[in-house]
Amino acid sequence: MTQTPANSHAIDSALLGLEDDESGSRIVREELKLLSTVKTALAGARARAEAPDEPKDDARLLEIREEISTARPDDLPALLEQMHNLGALRAQRGKGVVGVVDPNSPYFAHLRLEEDVPNGKPRKRDLLIGNKGYVDSASGVRVVDWRNAPVSKIFYRYVEGDDYEEELGDRIVEGRVLLRRSVAIVGGELRRVSTPEGVFLCDAQGKWRRLDPTRAKLRTEGTKAKLGDSNADGLTRADKVLPAIAAMIDKEQYNLITRPGTGIIAIQGSAGSGKTTVGLHRVAYLAETDPVRYRPERMMVVVPNEALIHYVRRVLPDLGVDGVPVTTFRRFATRTAVGLFPKLPLSISEETPTVVTRAKQHPGMLRVIRDAVEEMASDVRARLDAFADKWAGAGTVVKAWDKTAGDALKVRLTNLSAWADGNKDLGVSAKSLSQATCSALEALLTDARKQARAVLSTWDEVLTNRGRLATHMPDLNEMQMNQVHAWCVRQMRVRAEGERDGETPSVDTEDFAILLRIWQELRGALLGSDEKPMRFTHLLVDEVQDASAVELRVLLDLTGKEPAATLAGDVAQRMLDDGDDRGEFKWSDLLSELGMETAAIDPLKVSYRSTAEITSFARGVLGPHAHDAEPIATRHGPMVELFPFSSQGEAVAFLADALKELYASEPNANVAIVARFAQQAQVYFEGLERAEVPGVRRVAKQDFSWEAGVDVTDVRQTKGLEFDEVVLVDTNAASYPDAANTRHALYVGATRASHQLWCIASDKPSVLVEEGIKAAHALVQPAS
């Protein structure tokens, strides 16, 4: 039975809600009629596909294929022609198109073109843009694929009323865009029509209304929307990336900045609360107040990504501090480990199982390393006990050894040797030792020092001692622990034996931190490229919620036995991959693992970056994982919007129009298009590039230019960054299911926006987004 046309009763009667809107009624009627035609064509194609002759066609096709497999070469052309003709007949009946085109959402745009015809009258034709191509000549329906059909470029590159000239295939086509509309078709029903005349929306009860046109506009903050040129406020886009943050410091932040440089300061703050601002000003303050102790080269800033390296390197000189090393932990650890271990494989594994990464970043890894080194120290103590029993007057050796506790193993051995030679005071006298006893002791210590220098073999032992790993990682079940152990054993064997069975010796990224920590426990201070001990007087470590305890312990030990560091982080911004069930970040747990239970946690409560609307949305997204205290926003802005679409192509079309309109009025705007995953970002980048959106850039490796334009990226690339406007794309239920890690990811993406935030769904919207929108709308609006 043929399907009833969508909203058929509305085509020939007054449109509910648009009774007094003549132009709106005309536009919506046209689109309802067009959808009815398309649905009728699809229904007819489906009916033909189900015709009684179809099984016979299928059987004959199978027979021809069987004949082809055994046919003589001379018979092949005729058989192939038969198969082609039969396939064409089946296609005409509808099979092959009905199964591809989604009848519930067959297209998302309507284009009417007037093409110039050489030596003839211009020809008008209507095109529909969808996710799949479909042509029905009899009914005049033509749907083209938005990604592949050359003619779809006209829709993305031109607006209604434009003259166009495009190379389509092997010919140049010229003409005019008479009509250009975007539509939303959900469940086979027309729900939205977007035109230059207005946006028309149909609710669940079938009532149409014109949408407030400002909802679908991206706009910059305050006077910026009125600037119109890059010099209206005397600042280029690059200058605006570096605001005069000194003028924004509040009393709470000032108290943190001016603390003494020794000890640990742990700063907890929501996104945009000024954690990084405080940290950088603290570095500048220390350099100013004690320039000898806190020389720039004796401090270091550690940030989570390359983009923040560029940002910090530009901010610090503006604060009067030049020459402070700025790095990521990965960059620092890789460079240092390669220098310390020349024989270490340079190949980084790209196949590391998630559970192995989790184990190597586990807080318990610190205890695993410590236990391994303590076992080695206990072995030395046992050998010294036996030595004292054998050699006369050697009892003082054990007492002297115990006095060295607290230092790295090799340092302890070296100090004991110096004590025996009379060059080190350990609180007991070595005068009772005979020359023979001293010689025997030195032989023992020389052998022990060889073991203490063996960092690589200790590393292998640490990672392959299943019992020790299981003891300190009780949250990993037996199956997970077996996988971790098997991976580490295999890596060790390949490194020992060289390339085997096509496997190349490799390390995991997380191994660098483990190696450096083992070095510190066994040999003491890390060595720089000049082979001198690395020592810093103060460290700033940003986004610590994403760092492992091993990484932080490595960094803190760079400042000596009494750590001096500013740690900045946010419990809500921990980024975990799907399947990583490490749970919520807790400052207390981290500080306990680091042996700093007494360190105070200083909260920052004011959100300076984002508007109250964005802050409320972000808090709603976090749900049960939100901060204990509501962040205090300092200003209001546009409402956070959710725009649902039925496909990525429809979303790209809408977004391209909005971005073009924005840059026509505000060329200095800096917009981030942020997807959950890199693959999604690539689809939107290609679509916007195809639509010729000005200044569109694909950012895949934190290579932000900090210039005006559109950065298309994924959420992991944006940690710690800020943009005027942010559009979160594919905020679908599939991309952001209700899980702790997805709540945090969505929170991070949303809080990159300083002024305006949009969410675009190309399928069923995520319930997390809907919760955030509800929270934002619950906000009490200021009086106008």
Positions of predicted regions on the chain:
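Alpha-helical nucleic-acid-binding subdomain
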Residues: 287-540, 545-554, 563, 572, ...
